[in-house]
């Protein structure tokens, strides 16, 4: 690989569209600022719902071609964000989307008929080694991935967290697998987050506008569940500023998964940009370098 810019950001996500929903503005910002942004997507998203009726035949229970279609959607989204370095973990189709069910309590859970080639069933060391190779090649100063709950409990998000965390540790070990490249210790690691204050504010605006279906059942004054992060744990906020349009265009590129009348665009159209404009992060490795407001506004702060 040719010599890379001084600032290098690596993001590890489970399926196509996760990167845009969680970090689209962040990715667009750092590309625009000249940083090298690398996205690793762990599956093709083969088990996703198809929200476009004329493409319903692509679904896993029909022609099972959704994953291949989503490769194109992801490429289009990356074009919108300006990201040129995108890889699938182990190569396209190496790990299959596990799918997800909801248990009796309404929590995300692993399907009972999980396929042996699913990401959930992947050998952790094998999958981590695939990522170690990328880490040692790109040498990122910052890694972004999910928390231990995978943000909302999807098995592939949980597995992506495990793989990214293990790979970061292995990549730093000088004596581990020299054939995968020279050791590299990532200085800062962040988990994506949704701010409690931002979520409550956006929900309140939706309800006041008469929208009671977007995120149905979520009360702006009630409990929000583990996918929402208390503000005291938020370390970095990346404002959307001039990048929200790029993020929204990238979301539209994931056409089989995100509809313009769905919850993400509802939040945006009803001035709910606190969630999907500003992007929130928890620092789990490295030293924070907050500003006067007690927060970082640059993932590379202090480096």
Swiss-Prot record:
Biological-process GO terms, alphabetical: mycothiol biosynthetic process
Cofactors that this protein relies on: Zn(2+)
Keyword GTP-binding carried by entry: no
Sections of the chain in a coiled coil: none
Enzyme Commission (EC) number: 3.5.1.103
Molecular-function GO term, any one: zinc ion binding
Keywords assigned by UniProt, alphabetized: Hydrolase, Metal-binding, Zinc
InterPro entries: GlcNAc_PI_deacetylase-related (IPR003737), LmbE-like_dom_sf (IPR024078), Mycothiol_biosynthesis_MshB (IPR017810)
Enzyme class: hydrolase
Residues annotated to bind Zn(2+): 15, 18, 157
Domain of life of the source: Bacteria
Catalysis: reaction(s): 1D-myo-inositol 2-acetamido-2-deoxy-alpha-D-glucopyranoside + H2O = 1D-myo-inositol 2-amino-2-deoxy-alpha-D-glucopyranoside + acetate
UniProt cofactor note: Binds 1 zinc ion per subunit.
PANTHER family cross-referenced by the UniProt entry: 1D-MYO-INOSITOL 2-ACETAMIDO-2-DEOXY-ALPHA-D-GLUCOPYRANOSIDE DEACETYLASE, N-ACETYLGLUCOSAMINYL-PHOSPHATIDYLINOSITOL DE-N-ACETYLASE-RELATED
Its biological purpose: Catalyzes the deacetylation of 1D-myo-inositol 2-acetamido-2-deoxy-alpha-D-glucopyranoside (GlcNAc-Ins) in the mycothiol biosynthesis pathway.
Family to which this protein belongs: Belongs to the MshB deacetylase family.
NCBIfam families in UniProt: mycothiol_MshB
Protein name: 1D-myo-inositol 2-acetamido-2-deoxy-alpha-D-glucopyranoside deacetylase
Organism lineage: Bacteria, Bacillati, Actinomycetota, Actinomycetes, Propionibacteriales
């Amino acid at each position: 690989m040719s010599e890379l810019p001084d600032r290098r950001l690596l993001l590890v996500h489970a399926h196509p569209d996760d990167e845009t929903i969680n970090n689209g503005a962040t990715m667009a910002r750092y590309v625009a600022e000249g940083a090298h942004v690398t996205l690793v997507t762990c599956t093709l998203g083969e088990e996703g719902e198809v929200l476009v009726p004329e493409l319903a035949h692509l679904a896993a229970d029909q022609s099972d071609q959704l994953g291949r279609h989503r490769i194109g959607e992801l490429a289009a989204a990356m074009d919108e964000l300006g990201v040129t370095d995108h890889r699938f973990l182990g190569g396209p189709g190496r790990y299959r989307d596990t799918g997800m069910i909801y248990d009796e309590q309404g929590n995300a859970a692993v399907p009972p008929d999980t396929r042996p080639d699913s990401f959930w069933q992947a050998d952790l060391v094998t999958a981590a080694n695939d990522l170690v190779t990328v880490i040692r090649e790109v040498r990122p100063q910052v890694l972004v991935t999910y928390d231990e709950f995978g943000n909302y409990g999807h098995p592939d998000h949980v597995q992506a967290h495990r793989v990214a965390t293990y790979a970061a540790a292995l990549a730093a070990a000088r004596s581990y697998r020299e054939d995968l490249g020279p050791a590299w210790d990532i200085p800062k690691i962040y988990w994506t987050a949704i701010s409690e204050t931002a979520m409550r504010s956006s929900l309140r605006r939706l309800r006041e506008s008469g929208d009671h279906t977007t995120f149905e059942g979520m009360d702006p004054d009630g409990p929000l569940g583990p996918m929402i992060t208390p503000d005291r744990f938020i370390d970095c906020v990346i404002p959307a500023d001039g990048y929200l349009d790029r993020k929204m265009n990238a979301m539209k590129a994931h056409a089989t998964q995100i509809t313009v009348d769905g919850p993400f665009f509802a939040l945006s159209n009803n001035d709910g940009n606190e969630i999907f404009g500003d992007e929130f992060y928890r620092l789990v490795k490295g030293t924070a370098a907050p500003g006067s407001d007690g927060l970082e506004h640059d993932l590379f702060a202090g480096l």
